[in-house]
Amino acid sequence: MNNKYNYKNLKWLWLSILIMLLDIGTKYWVKTHFWIGEVLSVLPGINCYYVCNPGLAFGLFTNASLYYRWLFVWIITLVIVAFIIALYKLIERPKCYSISYSMVIGGALGNLLDRILYGAVVDFIDVHIKNWHWPTFNVADIAICIGITIVTIRFYYDFIKNNLY
């Protein structure tokens, strides 16, 4: 019998849960030790800056109505489900796909919980060089970005390898 699904890939959901718990824990620490808008210099160019982002990544749609904010919740939920299904269906793929999908799932779950519970995502990592500031982010955002970067690089590598050789 040919099984077209790989249950073994679901074992990587432990990484999703770990990332989600780390994200929740760091956000809880920030919320219990800082006032909104408070800044603490951690290292040169890195601050702990407690902000709440009701919009999407990079502050997009910050002024969106409540209707659109809940629409984002549903869309993000569907994306998480799609990544879990994709993880489940990965067959004969390098392990980095499972790891990267799990990172995206964990990060998305962490930010989704904030949206549902508080109506906004808690961000607190502020990176800057002189007057240039990267948008404030959190542990979930780091996991999502690393996960997407890994799968993009690997996908590109596989594409080149399969089409040039």
Swiss-Prot record:
GO cellular component: plasma membrane
GO biological process: proteolysis
Transmembrane segments: 10-30, 42-62, 71-91, 105-125, 133-153
Active site: 123, 141
Pathway per the UniProt entry: Protein modification; lipoprotein biosynthesis (signal peptide cleavage)
Coarse class of the protein's main subcellular location: membrane
Enzyme type, top EC level: hydrolase
GO molecular function, one term: aspartic-type endopeptidase activity
InterPro entries (alphabetical): Peptidase_A8 (IPR001872)
Keyword set, alphabetical order: Aspartyl protease, Cell inner membrane, Cell membrane, Hydrolase, Membrane, Protease, Transmembrane, Transmembrane helix
Role description: This protein specifically catalyzes the removal of signal peptides from prolipoproteins.
Name of the protein described by the UniProt record: Lipoprotein signal peptidase
Organism annotation: Blochmanniella pennsylvanica (strain BPEN)
